[in-house]
């Protein structure tokens, strides 16, 4: 069955180690997965594998961002402040 072998090979190329090396590596892999899925050239099984891997990467990125946000809260006295020009004016609001 050559088709099953092709699917297994494409699954292997889409499957990377479970944990990315960094946030940036996860984002780069996500961009690659999205581009390959948007091309419409992946077989159904490979698209499903890419979707699953993408979901894993999104979860990883969310966890990293949550950890960084927690660190910022600790460093900033548990009160997140908006960046200047985002949502409020630079003079402190209302």
Swiss-Prot record:
EC id: 3.1.11.6
Listed GO CC annotations: cytosol; exodeoxyribonuclease VII complex
Reaction it catalyzes: Exonucleolytic cleavage in either 5'- to 3'- or 3'- to 5'-direction to yield nucleoside 5'-phosphates
UniProt subcellular location: Cytoplasm
Keyword annotations of the record: Cytoplasm, Exonuclease, Hydrolase, Nuclease
Keyword Aminoacyl-tRNA synthetase on entry: no
Main location: cytoplasm
InterPro entries xrefs: Exonuc_VII_S, Exonuc_VII_ssu_sf
Keyword Hydrolase: yes
Domain of life: Bacteria
GO biological processes: DNA catabolic process
One term of GO molecular function: exodeoxyribonuclease VII activity
Pfam families (UniProt xref): Exonuc_VII_S (PF02609)
Family membership noted in the UniProt record: Belongs to the XseB family.
Functional summary from the UniProt entry: Bidirectionally degrades single-stranded DNA into large acid-insoluble oligonucleotides, which are then degraded further into small acid-soluble oligonucleotides.
HAMAP family linked to this entry: Exonuc_7_S
Subunit structure: Heterooligomer composed of large and small subunits.
Official protein name in the record: Exodeoxyribonuclease 7 small subunit
Species this protein is from: Ralstonia nicotianae (strain ATCC BAA-1114 / GMI1000) (Ralstonia solanacearum)
